[in-house]
Amino acid sequence: MKPLVLLSALVLLSFQVQADPIQNTDEETKTEEQSGEEDQAVSVSFGDREGASLQEESLRDLVCYCRTRGCKRRERMNGTCRKGHLMYTLCCR
């Protein structure tokens, strides 16, 4: 049952990341122009108070990053994420 819940949460997360447009502010535009930044942290939350049963320990420990290159060791590719017009690989561990 846990793998099914985890898989469902990851699918919903990837849909949410692709569906939510990110508005560019001046600060975000400056960040995009800096080519030195490779990795960006992503905040992941599953459900709300009604869906609190989904927040099992395995889901709360999930950490995801948007990476310009491939995933690092012990990370799995879980889709893509977008910031403005740039596409990144969504890597979770």
UniProtKB/Swiss-Prot annotation:
Intrachain disulfide bonds: C64-C92, C66-C81, C71-C91
Protein's UniProt keywords contain Protease: no
Annotated propeptide span(s): 20-58
InterPro entries: Alpha-defensin, Alpha-defensin_C, Alpha-defensin_N, Beta/alpha-defensin_C
Signal peptide residues on this chain, from the entry's feature table: 1-19
Disordered, as annotated region: 23-49
Transmembrane parts of this sequence: none
Key word Zinc-finger present: no
Reported tissue expression: Paneth cells of the small bowel.
Lineage: superkingdom: Eukaryota
PROSITE patterns, per the entry: DEFENSIN (PS00269)
Localization terms from the record: Secreted
Record-level GO cellular component terms: extracellular space
PANTHER family cross-referenced by the UniProt entry: ALPHA-DEFENSIN 1 (PTHR11876), ALPHA-DEFENSIN 1-RELATED (PTHR11876:SF2)
Function, as annotated: Has broad-spectrum antimicrobial properties. Has antibacterial activity against the Gram-positive bacterium L.monocytogenes EGD and the Gram-negative bacteria E.coli ML-35p and avirulent S.typhimurium 7953, but not against the mouse-virulent S.typhimurium 14028S. Probably contributes to the antimicrobial barrier function of the small bowel mucosa.
Protein name: Alpha-defensin 2
Gene: Defa2
